[in-house]
């Protein structure tokens, strides 16, 4: 059976997922789309989803599909995911699951009431080959992890990007993937602001350093520098009792030209994790065909949202160490 996929939100990521489903992956096709900007929906259909109908609302797309992808603005995610759960439809939701932790909690409660998993959150780094290999190395060779040094650097961000977005739009990936990497929970967060780059603007403090502590005592420092200029650069080094392990660099051709040894650095986040997007979405389609969901769960989205909210509070109190408190994990997500 070919799954009928509906896409809510046909911006860059929604359209790219439509291309992925129709041209790269197996077992599904995009049959319905919607977007608040009809021109965007029409461009998506014309470019990568010629068989899809354009509908007027998220509710119509959910009703017309076997499973849905929520790729709209983050503020709309909670309502649209809850509607998919109420309809019993598997739902892939791009991050954030909700813009506030209490919204993510409502999604968890709705899924619990349904009695089965229906939601997968788009934390694609868990599917990246480098992170998968790093997790296995941490598990089998390093001994107990002691520290993590990480960095998330973007060449630039638009003028509408503000200080809290460094947490909810950028650090959110590290919040999830490092929790997964360590199989551990956060207990505190702290934010420090170094000297600001001249390439930022009045509404954005850049760079930032976020310090996290886990229940097992692991200390994590994450540099967020979203106007670094030179490229899109993701770094992660785990320090264990027996040694260290580092996330590998993306595959690129090193050159020796003009008396210079060099290797290119990617500029676009889509290029850095393009393969992991394919793997995560195929994982969703496989589970959706069985009427359920796999991969990062609504609970993972909720845990990330709680941590992100505390980090934003820590931005407002630079240097203060604030507690991160998670409720007990429900049996559905054990």
UniProtKB/Swiss-Prot annotation:
The keyword Hydrolase does not apply. GO terms for biological process: inositol catabolic process. GO terms for molecular function: inositol 2-dehydrogenase (NAD+) activity; nucleotide binding. Keywords: NAD, Oxidoreductase. Gene3D superfamilies: Dihydrodipicolinate Reductase, domain 2, NAD(P)-binding Rossmann-like Domain. The keyword Oxidoreductase applies. Its EC number is 1.1.1.18. It catalyses: myo-inositol + NAD(+) = scyllo-inosose + NADH + H(+). It comes from the Bacteria. Involved in the oxidation of myo-inositol (MI) to 2-keto-myo-inositol (2KMI or 2-inosose). Belongs to the Gfo/Idh/MocA family. HAMAP family: IolG (MF_01671). This is Inositol 2-dehydrogenase. The gene is iolG.
């Amino acid at each position: 059976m070919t799954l009928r996929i509906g896409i809510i939100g046909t911006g860059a990521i929604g359209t790219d997922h439509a291309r992925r489903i129709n041209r790269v992956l197996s077992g599904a096709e995009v049959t319905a789309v919607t977007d608040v900007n009809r021109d965007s929906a029409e461009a998506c259909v014309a470019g990568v989803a010629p068989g899809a109908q354009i509908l007027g609302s998220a509710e119509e797309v959910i009703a017309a599909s076997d499973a849905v992808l929520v790729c709209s603005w983050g503020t709309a995610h909670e309502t649209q995911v809850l509607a998919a759960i109420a309809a019993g439809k598997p739902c892939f939701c791009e991050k954030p699951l909700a813009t506030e932790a209490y919204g993510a909690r409502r999604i968890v409660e709705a899924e619990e009431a349904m009695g089965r998993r229906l939601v997968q959150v788009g934390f694609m780094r868990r599917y990246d080959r480098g992170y998968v290999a790093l997790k296995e190395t941490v598990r089998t060779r390093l001994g107990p992890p002691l520290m993590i040094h990480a960095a998330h650097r973007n060449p630039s961000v638009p003028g509408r990007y503000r200080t809290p977005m460094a947490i909810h739009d950028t650090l959110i990936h590290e919040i999830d993937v490092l929790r997964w990497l360590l199989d551990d929970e956060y207990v505190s967060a702290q934010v420090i602001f170094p000297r600001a780059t001249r390439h930022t603007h009045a509404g954005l403090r850049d760079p930032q350093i976020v310090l996290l502590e886990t229940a097992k005592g692991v200390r994590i420092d994450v540099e967020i520098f979203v106007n670094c200029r030179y490229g899109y650069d993701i770094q992660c080094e785990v320090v264990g009792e027996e040694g260290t392990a580092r996330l590998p660099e993306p595959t690129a051709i090193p050159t020796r030209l003009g008396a210079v040894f060099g290797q290119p650095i990617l500029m676009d986040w889509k290029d850095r994790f393009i393969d992991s997007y394919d793997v995560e979405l195929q994982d969703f389609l496989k589970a959706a065909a069985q009427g359920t969901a796999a991969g990062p769960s609504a609970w993972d989205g909720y845990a990330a949202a709680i941590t992100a909210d505390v980090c934003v509070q820590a931005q407002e109190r630079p240097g203060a160490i604030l507690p991160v408190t998670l409720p007990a994990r429900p049996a559905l997500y054990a």
